Each structure stands twice: as C-alpha cells, then as structure tokens.
C-alpha cells in the first residue's frame, strides 16, 4: 500500500521539493536591461506596482537614474506632457518609474517601499497626494489586498524596528487584511510584543524565499511591456525636437481642444461618454456631503513620512486639484477641499517636508484636468515645471522633525484650525 502511494505521490513530492530548492537558492543578482527597464517603468500594471523584481532592477541600475513617482490612478493618464514622455523625449537625467494604481494610497505605498528600501536610501522621489484619498472610512480592504503580497509582508516584518510606526502599520494591516499570512507575528507587533529569536529566524527564512521567488518569476513577467508604445512612444512623435515649454504647450493644447469637444466640463471625450454622460442628472450635487477632513489616511500618510525620514529621502509632494466645473456641478465644497489641503500641508511642513507643488486652486484653468480629478495636458505641464527643476538639481534630504501625534486618532479626526492642534 505504501509503495503504491509512493508511486503515485512520490514524483509530485520530489518535483515540489526540487522547485522549492531551485527558488530558495536562485541568485538575486540582477542583469540590467535598459529597454526592459524603460518598459516596466511605464507599464502601470498591478505587477509592476506590487512585485519586487522589476522596480528594484530599474531603481538599482547604476547607468540610468530611475526616480519613483508614487501616486494612484493619475499615473495612468498619459498625453504629450506626461512626465514620462517629456523625460524620454528630451533625454533628461532621470526617468520616472510610475508606482500607482487606482484605489492605492499611502498604506499600499508604505508596504511597497519595504521591498526597495536600499534603492530609496538618500534618493529623491515624487509623491502625489490626492485629497480624495482622505475619505471617512479610508481604504477599501479589497483594493488594499489586491496590491499587497507576501513579499511585502516579509519585507515589512524583516525591517520593522518595534517603534510606533511598526505598531501602527501592523494594526492597519490587520484591519485591512484580517486573514493575512503570519497573522500571529503581525498581532505581536500590533500589541508591541517583542518577537522571539525563533520568530525572527522564520521571518528571515521566508523573506529570503520570497525575494528569490520574485527574482525567479520576475524574469518571465513581460505583461505591460507593450504599454510603452501607447503610453510613451506614440507621443514622442508629436512633440517638438527642441525643448520649449511654449512649443509643447501649443501641441498639447491642440490635442486637448480636439479631445474635449463633446462636453462643457473640459473632460476628455472618452471619459465623459463612459463615466459621466449616462448618469449626469444623478450626479448633480452628489458630493455635497463629502468631507476629507476626517480619515485614517492622515495616519497612513505619517507612515510614509516616517519611512522617508528613516531612509533620508528627499521628496517633492504634488497636491492636485479637482476639475472646477465638476466640483460645482457635483456640489463638492471648495472650502472643505482647501481646508483638507491646509491640513495635509501642515502635516508635511511642520515636520520639515517643505517641497510642495500645490495645484489645488488650479482646477478651473483650461485643459488643466483630464477628467474629474486627474491632471492632463496643461496640468501635466505645470507639474513638470515644478518637478523637473527639483529632480534635475538633486539635493540631500533636510533634517526632519517627526511628530508621533500625527499617528493619533485625534489628528485623523481633527477638523479645526491646524495651528491650534496640540
């Protein structure tokens, strides 16, 4: 009987063991390929966002300076003035590596950073903060889980230091992913219990396996590579060969005029037809009760700021506007929006994060927005005028002065004068 079972299952067990050993001992050294790295940088797929190997390979390339552009769905709005297009066309000293997906916000970005801490050390980054992230209930758990994986988990556990940031991150992880793997260890961190030697040895073992698994399977990941042609290459042909903001503006403005012809809100035709037109009447005043002043996202943002401080990262923060015509139609209160922006800015500036490009009042400018909340055309051009000088003239990170009160529920729910917050 045992012999018969072995004849059936033995080859499967041996094959499984061989695969495990292959992955466990697979080398993590990376061979750089500029063409592949450029394609992964603008792929904007879920894989390029949450998996380790592609982004680490690009960000560690000694010959090309890829810069992380953290955000959410705005990364996916391409046109002739998109930063990835301009950097390629005019052969700038850097190339954006786009790290964003619809529904992603600071918590996903924090866990994704754990996979590439050496590549962030002493570097510059671009971080887009959308006030829309700061909803009352914060993240949709399904969206968070979609962009989270085991490699992020073991990277976090491996690098955590038992401080307040680690405790908060563990607590939020349990809220967003109650059945997360290694839940007992995450619960220990959330409870401020010290991990045992055995715990740390297991974390180290699994982290090593996950890192090598990412290296092994990452070499086969080509999904999204074709996006380079439609995201970047097709726009290179329409831009002037000699760099000139005025000449670029003329080109993208003509494109915007052509592609916003079917509505009065200055939105891209396709977006308006697909997302707005059929529900236009129902959307009238649909956002009158929205508020972004009370949200766990403020605490999640503090996680990112803490990581930037630890890694001596020098970021520039971008705060986008809402399409003004859409804001008025949907009833979104501008005073609330500006109060949200002031709260975000206070959290940044009071801790030493002073590189901020605030476009929150520019949503009424022609061709500034692609749709309701995303930059496009002249909005991207304004973005570039702020970001390019920052990245083209690198400076070290300043000295930050972190305030752990920004992890508190008091701050997350505070809607008063920020200068009076204690």
Walk through the language-model features, giving the residues of each.
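Extended hydrophobic/aromatic segments used for targeting, binding, or gating
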Residues: 88, 293-299, 303-367
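Membrane-embedded segments
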Residues: 74-165
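Short loop/turn segments at strand-loop or loop-helix junctions that form parts
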Residues: 71-72, 128-132, 270-279, 318-323, ...
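Alpha-helical transmembrane signal-anchor/signal-peptide segments
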Residues: 25-47
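Hydrophobic membrane-insertion alpha-helices, especially the h-region
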Residues: 4-26
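C-terminal regions of proteins
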Residues: 99-101, 336, 342-422
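Catalytic nucleophile-elbow at a beta strand-turn-alpha helix junction centered on a G-D-S/GDSL motif
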Residues: 59-81
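Secreted/periplasmic serine-hydrolase-like ester/acetyl group-modifying domain
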Residues: 35-36, 156-300, 403-422
